[in-house]
UniProtKB/Swiss-Prot annotation:
Record-linked PROSITE patterns: DNA_LIGASE_A1, DNA_LIGASE_A2, DNA_LIGASE_A3
Gene that encodes it: OPG180
Annotated source species: Vaccinia virus (strain Copenhagen)
Sequence similarity: Belongs to the ATP-dependent DNA ligase family.
Intracellular or extracellular location(s): Host cytoplasm
Record's protein name: DNA ligase
Main localization, broad class: host cell
Superkingdom as given in the UniProt entry: Viruses
Keyword Magnesium: yes
Length: 552
């Protein structure tokens, strides 16, 4: 059984390794001949763990300030300079309530058991007891590691591809398809990963689209032909049905709020009368009595009340699994034809997505113009012979910003990293916001632009919604995770960028700026479009995505 001390050393070695091959080799050598491979890999990828601990960095600080009898304010201030694990380690070492162990005695199994128990409690008193108990058997470095596992970020600069491909060269691609880590580990020794396929009731990484700024580019990418599909301004939903059981997952593979999808349990069996088990890729949209889509955000309970005679409608655009058959390796035109054979439309409830087989540039231009005239968001272009590749950006999207707002082919989903005091009537409150993106290579957050222009009501709400730490533009208080030039140091920084809001930002065009740290990329005339509540930081626009957007 692997000890926590061995695991910590592995994490340290991975962090200091120079590149992909070296990191993967370290992991491969470490897990060879070990019986607890699955546990090691699972804990190396805490972000994929579906256990919920009901506590963010601020809550962890609060609880350990009580346990250590230390100043919560001092601990929060220390957190502003670095990461939660370092802060807890520092104050654990200094506290006089619980003496840290001199020697590590915990196994990974002990830690995993603790995490499972922690995920089962919600009362603060129970959390305090569990956190006290684990601290009492930890060294300072042990507790730092445990807290980082709770925070779901080990800071080892190695994501799923690095870790999973240490098991087998194609393990990462198989995982994106099956989302079943345990099955991959169990089959890795048999060299039989290709046999692993979709599992009903387990979410699949959705296939994605990259931006496209010209009709000509689309034909270069799909020379053998393409489908142009209406880009619906709703919420992506992956539908799973297994006999009489149903599951509905969002684009980030989390369960969809029940009020948005409960009605589907009645209509899916009617639309798919022959299906025992099925997995669908689709979009749920609020439509009026004429089946015309209503604006994004109208799916909320309160917003829906504003639209009388409206219905939730599922626009189905793909079938990924049907009665034991994994259909992801079948060409799109065959999947679509099959879908037509097995699905019966229920008007205003479950319908086919609007799809056009494109044969020339003039036809594509006409379809795009028609979509924009109807005030739809744009088009998604798909290779007519394309297979379904989970998690990969093989499709193209053309949105209205490309034609109507200048040369930005697409908006960017940026994370709120900080804020500045407003001026005049907005003085004394956060009114201007620092937006940025995550750099996968460095593990840091980079700045892209400042954004303002919110109305008074929105600003009032944001004061409470955004969890900020006041740093008063002090360079010494810039957290380790943020890379920002001196002229853009904010009055406030977010407590945790991975828990911060994601805003869709559009503008006139992407520009070059030596003052911003996201490879010098910024946005001219940036404007807030909407909050992307359907996305986590992982689905936001990362630095490499931003670079691709500017190229297109």
């Amino acid at each position: 059984m692997t000890s926590l001390r061995e695991f910590r050393k592995l994490c340290c070695d991975i962090y200091h390794a120079s590149g992909y091959k070296e990191k993967s080799k370290l992991i491969r050598d470490f897990i060879t001949d070990r019986d607890d491979k699955y546990l090691i890999i699972k804990l190396l990828l805490p972000g994929l763990d579906d256990r919920i601990y009901n506590m963010n960095d601020k809550q962890i600080i609060k609880l350990y300030s009580i346990i250590f009898k230390q100043s919560q304010e001092d601990m929060l201030q220390d957190l502003g300079y670095g990461y939660i694990g370092d802060t807890i380690r520092t104050f654990f070492k200094e506290n006089t309530e619980i003496r840290p162990r001199d020697k590590s005695i915990l196994t990974l199994e002990d830690v995993d058991s603790f995490l499972t128990t922690l995920s089962s409690v919600t009362k603060e008193s129970h959390q305090i007891k569990l956190l006290t108990d684990i601290a009492s058997v930890c060294t300072c470095n042990d507790l730092k590691c445990v807290v980082m596992l709770i925070d779901k970020d080990l800071k080892i600069k190695a994501g799923p591809r690095y870790v999973l491909n240490a098991i087998s060269p194609n393990a990462y691609d198989v995982f994106r398809k099956s989302n079943n880590l345990k099955e991959i580990i169990e089959n890795s020794s048999k060299q039989n990963l290709d046999s692993i396929s979709i599992s009903v009731m387990t979410p699949i990484n959705p296939m994605l689209a990259e931006s496209c700024d010209s009709v000509n580019k689309a034909f270069k990418k799909f020379p053998s032909g393409m489908f142009a599909e209406v880009k619906y301004d709703g919420e992506r939903v992956q539908v799973h049905k297994n006999n009489n059981e149903f599951a509905f997952f969002s684009r980030n593979m989390k369960p969809v709020l029940s009020h948005k999808v409960d009605y589907l349990k009645e209509y899916i069996p009617k639309a798919f009368k022959k299906a025992t088990s099925i997995v669908l890729d689709s979009e749920i949209v609020l439509v009026d009595e004429h089946n015309v889509p209503l604006p994004f955000g109208s799916l909320g309970i309160h917003k829906k009340k504003e639209y009388k005679n409206s219905n939730m409608c599922l626009f189905v655009f793909d079938c990924l699994y049907f009665d034991g058959f994994d259909m992801t390796d079948i060409p799109l035109y065959e999947r679509r034809s099959f879908l037509k054979d097995v699905m019966v439309e229920i008007p205003n409830r479950i319908v086919f997505s609007e799809l056009t087989n494109i044969s020339n540039e003039s036809q594509l231009t006409d379809v795009l113009d028609d979509a924009l005239t109807r005030k739809l968001e744009g088009l998604v272009l798909k290779d007519i012979n394309g297979v379904y590749e989970p998690g990969k950006r093989r499709w193209l999207k053309i949105k209205r910003d490309y034609l109507n707002e200048g040369s930005m082919a697409d908006s960017a989903d940026l994370v709120v990293l900080g804020a500045y005091y407003g001026k005049g009537a907005k003085g004394g409150i956060m009114a201007v916001f620092l937006m940025g993106c995550y750099d996968d290579e460095s593990g840091k957050w980079k700045t892209v632009t400042k954004c303002s222009g919110h109305d008074d009501n929105t600003l009032r709400v944001l004061q409470d919604q955004l969890t900020m730490i006041k740093i008063n533009k002090d360079p010494k208080k810039i957290p380790e995770w943020l890379v920002v030039n001196k002229i853009y140091i904010p009055d406030f920084v977010v407590e945790d960028p991975k828990q911060s809001q994601i805003w869709e930002i559009s503008g006139a065009e992407f520009t070059s700026s030596k003052s911003h740290t996201a490879n010098g990329i910024s946005i001219r005339f940036p404007r807030f479009t909407r909050i992307r509540e359907d996305k986590t930081w992982k689905e936001s626009t990362h630095l490499n995505d931003l670079v691709n957007l500017t190229k297109s």
